[in-house]
């Protein structure tokens, strides 16, 4: 018996010695909050970094062991891939809503550690396989191509510019905020942008805020200079101009108040009304690097149901930004967009334009949206390419670039502003969500030629 006891004691001591040679395993998440969508393709992932002293990280096991709301996603809906110290977690959502997922690492000796991943799933949308979600902000309002499959996206609730990979859903690769350079303490309400060479021109809405109050920062146009392309894109601040609204009002007054700009900018005037004042499109005229087309969401012309969309050419736009010269204007252009207004306008090197058309109103996003093509000639009418879907969250706000519209099957990527959308079914507007990782705008590819 004594020998038996001694033998058992020796085994016990040996086991303790072996256990003591390994530390407690650890894991960290690249983000504690993650957003996905039902039926989505290329949804965002979270990287899990694991370690255990005395052990090869590749020998550790990572699993998801619990979901707090299995109607949204079960543990079987979570995939963990990768080897070594970094693993990737992807969730395939079952339904709209929130769930907390328990991520566990198991060490080679059976010791464990856990972290909680807070997951939010938005509902399925049309064109799901052609949709991607740009996270970090829900209020996308303008976009320009950065080359190499990337785009720079502006936000009308902040002054942050974000660089995204257009092919996948996820967080921005890089961000910039030039508020201090511009001298802006509030949002500029960026609504339009266009690129000429290495210069990107950005414009605020130029209108009052939603309460009809004048906010000086919204009366801002500025430039950034681009270096690099794709994931290596970098931006530097250029110059700003803060009197374009004033120039437009003075020009309209001098021409008989044809468009009612003075009344549209008056104290108390709501900008997103049929007779309001709100800029949302910016692009250069065909073959020009000096004359810019400023596209209006409001007013329509005339300011009645069925009125035409308004473009005012700024004939010295380059000089306005480069030297602060007061803006001069050409003959205004009125386009028949079926009673809709301009929400974005973009052209390619062949002077083929796409116009995102939508309501002047600040209604919900069930109002009609359409995509038109145009050749930039004021004498020529735009042609409707397609009606855009309106049953999903978000309003169509931007088109990244324009493909060759003479080629069959050409596709364009459009982006929604989801700031007012209830993405997760709990009554919270996306702009008010407590975590930036849950905020997102949707980018969808549409075929625009037959």
Please report, for each region that a protein language model flagged, where it lies by residue.
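C-terminal region of N-terminal signal peptides and the immediate post-cleavage residues
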Residues: 7-24, 193
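Extracellular ectodomain surface segments
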Residues: 23-61
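Low-complexity "stalk/linker" and mucin-like segments enriched in Ser/Thr/Pro/Ala/Gly
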Residues: 63-87
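Sequence/structural signature of beta-propeller domains
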Residues: 83, 120-450
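Extracellular/luminal low-complexity segments enriched in Ser/Thr/Pro
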Residues: 86-98
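Conserved structural position at the C-terminal beta-strand
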Residues: 105-107
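C-terminal edge beta-strand
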Residues: 111-123
């Amino acid at each position: 018996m004594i020998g038996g006891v001694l033998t058992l004691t020796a085994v016990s001591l040996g086991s303790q010695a072996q256990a003591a040679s390994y530390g407690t395993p650890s894991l960290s998440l690249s983000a504690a909050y993650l957003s996905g969508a039902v039926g989505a393709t290329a949804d965002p992932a979270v990287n899990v970094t694991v370690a255990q002293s005395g052990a090869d990280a590749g020998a550790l096991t990572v699993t998801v062991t619990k979901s707090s709301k299995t109607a949204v996603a079960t543990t079987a809906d979570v995939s963990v891939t990768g080897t070594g110290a970094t693993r990737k977690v992807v969730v395939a959502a079952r339904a709209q809503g929130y769930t907390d997922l328990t991520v566990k690492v198991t060490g080679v000796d059976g010791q464990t550690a856990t972290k909680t991943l807070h997951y939010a799933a938005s509902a399925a949308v049309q064109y799901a396989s052609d949709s991607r979600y740009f996270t970090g902000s829900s209020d996308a309002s303008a976009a320009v191509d950065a080359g190499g499959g990337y785009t720079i996206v502006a936000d009308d609730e902040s002054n942050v510019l974000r660089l995204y990979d257009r092919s996948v859903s996820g967080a921005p690769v890089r961000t910039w905020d030039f508020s201090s350079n511009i001298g802006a303490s509030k949002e500029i309400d960026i609504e339009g942008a266009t690129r000429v060479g290495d210069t990107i021109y950005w414009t605020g809405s130029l209108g009052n805020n939603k309460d009809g109050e004048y906010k000086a920062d919204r009366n801002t146009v500025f430039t950034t200079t681009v270096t690099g392309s794709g994931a290596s894109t970098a931006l530097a601040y250029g110059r700003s101009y803060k009197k374009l609204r004033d120039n437009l009002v003075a020009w309209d007054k001098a021409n008989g108040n044809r468009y009612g700009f003075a009344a549209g900018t008056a104290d108390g005037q709501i900008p997103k009304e049929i007779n309001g004042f709100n800029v949302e499109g910016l692009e250069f005229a065909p073959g020009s690097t000096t004359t810019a087309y400023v596209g209006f969401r409001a007013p329509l012309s005339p300011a009645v149901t069925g009125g035409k969309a308004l473009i005012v050419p700024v004939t010295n736009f380059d000089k306005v930004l480069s030297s602060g010269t007061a803006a001069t204007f050409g003959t205004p252009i009125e386009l028949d967009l079926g009673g809709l207004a301009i929400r974005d306008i973009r052209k390619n090197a062949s002077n083929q334009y796409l116009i995102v058309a939508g309501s002047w109103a600040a209604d919900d996003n069930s109002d009609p949206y359409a995509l038109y093509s145009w050749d930039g000639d004021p004498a020529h009418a735009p042609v409707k390419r397609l009606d855009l879907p309106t049953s999903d969250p978000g309003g169509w706000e931007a088109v990244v670039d324009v493909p060759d519209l003479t080629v069959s099957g050409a596709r364009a990527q459009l982006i929604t502003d989801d700031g007012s959308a209830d993405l997760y079914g709990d009554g919270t507007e996306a702009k008010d969500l407590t975590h930036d990782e849950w905020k997102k705008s949707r980018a969808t590819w549409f075929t625009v030629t037959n």
